[in-house]
Amino acid sequence: MFNWVKTAMLMAGITALFIVIGGMIGGTRGMTIALLFALAMNFFSYWFSDKMVLRMYNAQEVDENTAPQFYRMVRELATRANLPMPRVYLINEDAPNAFATGRNPEHAAVAATTGILRVLSEREMRGVMAHELAHVKHRDILISTITATMAGAISALANFAMFFGGRDENGRPANPIAGIAVALLAPIAGALIQMAISRAREFEADRGGAQISGDPQSLATALDKIHRYAAGIPFQAAEAHPATAQMMIMNPLHGGGLQNLFSTHPATEERIARLMEMARTGRFD
């Protein structure tokens, strides 16, 4: 429940930030235009992002004939989660990782790298795919699409304000110093909120995945393995498309500096600790 409340508050925050910047550029009209612009971008992302992401990673759809064990695992977990069967994809990459995409549970897809199938045991793989199906069940793909779109739009509007200035409610030019401050600080604030939402949704997917599989310990050991192996194996497709990093079960990017604030994922140690506590107590709340 805490993660859902936190997500709602952060979503409200990023929406407010977006509208305020629109207002600084052009008063009420600016806010209206900004909101309509965000809605248009969200609509496009909502309907087409899954196809774009799968194409970026050259993901190949599989079925019960081409990947029988993996496909049956996903089907069994989808049944346990009371979800429609998603499309199942494999990505020919050594880096161990997985993600879910799709605009809703009826149009969902899950994908895993060939590397993760080699690294994890069957029980651990069940934990990972249960985590991805929890994202589908919680409609996190929609949430991440909205936040990523709005964070990008905030940056674009802030740059517009810096280079072209803004207008107040009466049409007078806005304070240029305020415009520069907005251009510098608003994109950072938007990114911070976006990352915080992503981390909250990862915690919630860990909890939901543990409920679906009934085995939080296996997800914990899977995260530990993925973290250790991924550190030494570059994920080239993810490095080429860093905006998709938040979709993965483990952050595939290798960067430093202010990592906790700008990371799309919580610290692996904290995720493991929470899952082990679930395993110890048998409670998933």
From Swiss-Prot:
Question: Catalytic residues?
Answer: E132
Gene Ontology terms for molecular function? metalloendopeptidase activity; zinc ion binding
Cofactor field: Zn(2+)
CDD domains the record matches: M48B_HtpX_like
Q: Which domain of life is it from?
A: Bacteria
Residues binding Zn(2+) are: H131, H135, E202
User: How would you describe this protein's topology in the membrane?
Assistant: Multi-pass membrane protein
Stated name of the protein: Protease HtpX homolog
